[in-house]
C-alpha cells in the first residue's frame, strides 16, 4: 500500500495514524471535497472509526478515551466544507454522547444528493445559498452494498432545527437518477429523531424524466405505453404520503413536502398527480437567470443596441416566449426600449414531422412609462434588410432538427441578422453534441439542469446556472 505524500493534495493528519491507514485517511480527506464523487455519510463514519482504532467499525463505536483525538480528526477533516455544521452529528455517529456545547443554532438548509454521483447543480445551489448568508450543510447519503445494490444512510440524529431539507435528484438512469433511489432518500425522514427537527422537505427534480418524451398522435398499435410523467409522480408521492401517515403517530409537527421541477409547461402532468396526492408541485421559471446571462453577453459583444426579435417556435411556446420577452425587455436598457415577438406556425402531418414553417404573427413591444405597449406588425413579404438579433427559445435542445428548419427559414426572412441565439432550459442532446452544429446558431444559452459530458467545453455554449432560480422558488 502506497503512503500518500502529505502537503501536495492532502495535508498531514492532525493525529497519529497507523501506517496502513494513511491511504484511507487521504482518500477520505479528498472524498469529502470531491464534488463529482462525494464520500457518502456511511463511508465518512466507518472510515473515521477505523482511523480511530476501531477493529470492527460496523459494530463497535470509538472508545471514550479517544474523545480528544476524535475531535481533532473530525474538525480537521470537515474544515471549510459543507459537513462543518454537522460536527456534533458526526461525533454522535462515532459513538460519543453528551459532548458539552452551547445550544446549536438552527440550520437554514440541509441538502441531500438524491442520485448516484451528486449533481453539479447541488453544489451550485449550496454555494448560492451560502452567498446569501444562509447556513448550509450537504450530505451524500447514497452508497452501495457489496453486491452493488444502492445503500442509503443518513444521520441517525440531528441536534438542531432545520428549516428546509432539499433533495436534489433525477428520475433518469442515464444521469445516475432513479425513482427507487429517490424514494429511499425520502425515507430518511422516516426516522422520527430526524423528522421532528425538520420544518419542510423540498424535492427538486430539475428535469422530470418522461415529461417530454410522449407525443400525442403516435400509433397506439405499437404497444401500450406507460405514461412515466404520471406514473413516476405517483411513485414519488407514495413514500412521502406513507411517511406522513406513520410519523403523525410519533411526532407532533410533521414536515411539509413540496415537489419542484424546471420549466414544466404541461398543466396536467406531473402537476395534477402530485396535487391529487395532496402535495404542492411548483414549476420553476428559469427565465430570469437566462435573460441576465444574455444581457451580459450582448454587452460584451457591444451589440446591446441592435434590435432584438424573440421567436416562439410554435403555438404552444407562445406563453413561455412572451414571459421571456417581458423579462428581456425589462433589462435591455435605455438604448433598446423595444423588441419584436415572432410567432411561428408549423404544419405537422404527424408527431415529430414538420412539413412547413411560416410566421403567423409579429408584435412590437415597447417600454413606455413602466408599461409594455404591444402593437401588431405586418408580416414581411420580402426579406428584411435591417440588422437584428434573433433569439429562439425552447424548453429543451435535443436533436436540433426542428430548430434547424426554423432558423433556416428565419435566416431567409431576416438575412441581415447579425447574431442568432438559441436558448434552452434542458440539454437533452440524445444524439450528442452534433445538435449544435446542425442548428447553426451563433451562440447557445443552455441551462445546467442535466450533466452532459463535454457540454461545458463547447466554445459557443454558455451554460446558465439555474441554482438561483431554484433557490428563489424554494424561498417563496
Language-model regions, residue ranges each:
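PRPP-associated nucleotide enzymes
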Residues: 1-476
Amino acid at each position: 500500500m502506497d503512503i500518500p505524500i502529505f502537503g501536495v493534495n492532502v495535508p498531514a493528519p492532525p493525529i497519529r495514524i497507523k501506517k496502513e491507514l494513511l491511504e484511507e485517511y487521504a482518500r477520505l480527506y479528498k472524498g469529502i471535497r470531491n464534488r463529482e464523487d462525494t464520500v457518502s455519510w456511511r463511508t465518512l463514519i466507518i472510515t473515521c472509526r477505523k482511523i480511530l482504532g476501531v477493529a470492527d467499525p460496523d459494530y463497535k463505536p470509538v472508545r471514550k478515551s479517544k474523545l480528544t483525538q476524535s475531535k481533532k480528526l473530525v474538525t480537521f477533516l470537515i474544515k471549510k466544507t459543507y459537513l462543518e455544521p454537522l460536527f456534533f452529528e458526526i461525533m454522535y455517529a462515532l459513538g460519543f454522547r453528551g459532548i458539552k456545547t452551547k445550544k446549536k443554532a438552527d440550520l437554514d438548509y440541509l441538502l441531500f444528493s438524491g442520485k448516484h454521483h451528486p449533481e453539479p447543480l447541488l453544489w451550485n445551489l449550496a454555494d448560492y445559498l451560502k452567498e446569501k448568508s444562509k447556513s448550509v450543510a450537504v450530505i451524500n447519503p447514497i452508497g452501495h452494498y457489496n453486491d452493488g445494490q444502492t445503500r442509503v444512510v443518513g444521520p441517525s440524529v440531528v441536534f438542531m432545527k432545520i428549516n428546509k431539507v432539499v433533495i436534489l435528484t433525477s428520475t433518469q438512469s442515464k444521469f445516475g437518477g432513479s425513482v427507487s433511489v429517490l424514494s429511499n432518500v425520502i425515507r430518511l425522514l422516516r426516522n422520527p429523531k430526524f423528522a421532528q427537527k425538520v420544518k419542510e422537505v423540498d424535492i427538486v427534480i430539475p428535469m422530470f424524466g418522461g415529461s417530454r418524451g410522449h407525443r400525442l398522435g403516435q400509433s397506439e398499435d405499437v404497444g401500450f405505453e406507460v405514461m412515466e410523467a404520471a406514473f413516476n409522480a405517483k411513485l414519488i408521492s407514495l413514500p412521502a404520503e406513507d411517511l406522513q401517515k406513520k410519523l403523525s403517530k410519533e411526532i407532533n409537527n410533521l414536515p411539509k413536502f413540496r415537489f419542484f421541477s424546471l420549466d414544466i409547461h404541461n398543466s396536467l402532468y406531473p402537476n395534477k398527480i402530485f396535487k391529487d396526492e395532496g402535495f404542492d408541485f411548483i414549476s420553476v421559471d428559469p427565465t430570469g437567470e437566462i435573460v441576465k446571462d444574455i444581457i451580459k453577453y450582448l454587452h460584451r459583444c457591444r451589440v446591446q443596441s441592435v434590435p432584438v426579435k424573440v421567436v416562439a417556435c410554435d403555438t404552444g411556446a407562445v406563453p413561455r416566449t412572451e414571459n421571456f420577452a417581458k423579462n428581456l425587455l425589462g433589462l435591455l436598457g435605455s438604448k433598446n426600449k423595444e423588441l419584436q415577438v415572432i410567432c411561428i406556425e408549423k404544419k405537422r402531418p404527424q408527431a415529430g414531422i414538420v412539413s412547413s414553417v411560416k410566421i403567423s404573427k409579429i408584435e412590437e413591444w415597447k417600454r413606455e412609462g413602466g408599461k409594455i405597449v404591444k402593437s401588431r406588425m405586418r408580416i414581411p413579404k420580402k426579406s428584411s434588410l435591417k440588422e437584428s438579433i434573433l433569439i429562439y427559445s425552447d424548453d429543451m435542445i435535443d436533436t436540433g432538427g426542428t430548430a434547424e428548419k426554423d432558423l433556416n427559414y428565419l435566416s431567409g426572412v431576416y438575412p441581415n441578422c447579425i447574431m442568432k441565439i438559441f436558448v434552452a432550459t434542458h440539454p437533452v442532446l440524445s444524439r450528442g453534441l452534433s445538435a449544435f452544429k446542425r442548428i447553426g446558431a451563433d451562440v447557445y444559452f443552455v441551462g445546467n439542469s442535466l450533466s452532459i459530458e463535454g457540454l461545458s467545453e463547447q466554445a459557443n455554449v454558455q451554460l446558465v446556472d439555474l441554482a438561483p432560480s431554484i433557490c428563489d422558488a424554494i424561498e417563496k
